[in-house]
UniProtKB/Swiss-Prot annotation:
Summary of the function given for this chain in its UniProt record: Sequence-specific DNA-binding protein required for the establishment and maintenance of lysogeny.
Protein name, entry field: Repressor protein C1
Annotated region described as Disordered, given as residue ranges: 254-283
Residue ranges of the annotated DNA-binding region, renumbered to this chain: 30-49
Lineage of producing organism: Viruses, Duplodnaviria, Heunggongvirae, Uroviricota, Caudoviricetes
GO molecular function ontology, one term from the record: DNA binding
Annotated organism of origin: Enterobacteria phage P7
UniProt KW keywords: DNA-binding, Repressor, Transcription, Transcription regulation
Membrane-traversing stretches: none
InterPro entries, sorted: Lysogenic_reg_DNA-binding, Repressor_C1
Amino acid sequence: MINYVYGEQLYQEFVSFRDLFLKKAVARAQHVDAASDGRPVRPVVVLPFKETDSIQAEIDKWTLMARELEQYPDLNIPKTILYPVPNILRGVRKVTTYQTEAVNSVNMTAGRIIHLIDKDIRIQKSAGINEHSAKYIENLEATKELMKQYPEDEKFRMRVHGFSETMLRVHYISSSPNYNDGKSVSYHVPLCGVFICDETLRDGIIINGEFEKAKFSLYDSIEPIICDRWPQAKIYRLADIENVKKQIAITREEKKVKSAASVTRSRKTKKGQPVNDNPESAQ
């Protein structure tokens, strides 16, 4: 029998531990982000080597408590409260921070979207119609008609834009398992932040507020649905997303085949062997 009284006590203990851990990390951080409500989040902390064992012990405690709390499903604890667990990056030579666009995604069915639109339309009409609300309702009705073209269980992805988050460009030392031939490795800083052990941090940390846009997104090739009900969101049909993913995979595979054929052709040319660019003609 599951002891939910103990589970609730454990959860309260975890929340207190987590809040204090994050508060101390923010207080000593070289960089923090601000959440939409003003809370400091994503602390980036350069950690003296002599403190790594004590911080790792606290991280291990976080991990154990989070895993134990998963045994109490009826408490309905959001996974975002328990995870991710903070991390210590080791074997780092140099770190540069930069900003990138953050996107929150949520999946909804066409039926759910229509329900929320209908609810908002009723609220707007009950408050009285003016020029602004009339245009707003008109936009909602247009989106509703679009959604009615699909089955109620047709799935859509709503991607909310409009805020940024911190990324790291990490250079590891050559003996690190994460070494990337001298090239940097991107690291997404979660809300709980990250620690960077200073033992090998010869070239230090560079705090860069520069904003970098992703070079390519599969969503670039899909026409989004825009609805005033969600002004900072773009809505995409999941089936369209999957189709683009498949096309990207096909294109990538075709490039591999062409590249392999090009290498083979080059090798044969060097050896003085004849090259047949149309294998079917040999049949």
